[in-house]
Amino acid sequence: MDRAEKREFVAWLNGAFKESGSVVVAHYTGLTVAQMSDLRSKMRDAGGSVKVAKNRLAKIALQGTESEGIADLFTGQTVVAYANDPITAPKVAVEFAKANDKLVILGGAMGATTLNADGVKSLASLPSLDELRAKLVGMIQTPAQRLAVLTSAPAGQIARVIGAHARKNEAA
């Protein structure tokens, strides 16, 4: 990579850090190419990205972003996972790390908040934005369904009383 390519890469990575909702930094020493491809594929399917960058370039790219506090995590063989949804990158990275011991989560950032490895894991346990929306819609729909059942119940009860009265008169 010559200087111009490095400048372009740093500018691109800086933009990715600024736009992302969360960033996860992990060591990937010992991961095979197939495992790394699997991680990239899972992250892409979830709406995130995985990037391996030189530590020096990643630290430069972090300057001027909210995630600048995680620059100290870039030592050794590091991989960066990021996504616009704050829950996506931590969730996919933690799930992958559970299956592959060689991916070791070092920490990350969500906006200006710097997270340690435990913080990333607890963030991964939260429901995603889509799951929260589904729960909210369910909460809104439930009272409406109950109201519909309650308003139709008296009519059904009246019909049953009239039917029972009619059967009683026929029997007599």
UniProtKB/Swiss-Prot annotation:
Keywords of the record, alphabetical order, are: Ribonucleoprotein, Ribosomal protein, RNA-binding, rRNA-binding
Q: Which GO terms describe its cellular component?
A: large ribosomal subunit
Gene3D superfamilies in UniProt: 3.30.70.1730, 6.10.250.290
Q: Which GO terms describe its biological process?
A: translation
Query: What GO MF annotations does this protein's record show?
Result: large ribosomal subunit rRNA binding; structural constituent of ribosome
Keyword RNA-binding assigned to the entry: answer is: yes
Q: Which InterPro entries match?
A: Ribosomal_uL10 (IPR001790), Ribosomal_uL10-like_sf (IPR043141), Ribosomal_uL10_bac (IPR022973), Ribosomal_uL10_bac_type (IPR047865), Ribosomal_uL10_CS_bac (IPR002363)
Q: How does it assemble?
A: Part of the ribosomal stalk of the 50S ribosomal subunit. The N-terminus interacts with L11 and the large rRNA to form the base of the stalk. The C-terminus forms an elongated spine to which L12 dimers bind in a sequential fashion forming a multimeric L10(L12)X complex.
**NCBIfam families assigned to the protein according to its UniProt record, in alphabetical order:** PRK00099.1-1
Q: Identify its protein family.
A: Belongs to the universal ribosomal protein uL10 family.
Describe its function.
Answer: Forms part of the ribosomal stalk, playing a central role in the interaction of the ribosome with GTP-bound translation factors.
Q: Cite the HAMAP family for this sequence.
A: Ribosomal_uL10
Protein name per Swiss-Prot or TrEMBL: Large ribosomal subunit protein uL10
User: What is the native source organism of this protein?
Assistant: Brucella canis (strain ATCC 23365 / NCTC 10854 / RM-666)
* Taxonomic classification: Bacteria, Pseudomonadati, Pseudomonadota, Alphaproteobacteria, Hyphomicrobiales
Supply the gene name.
rplJ
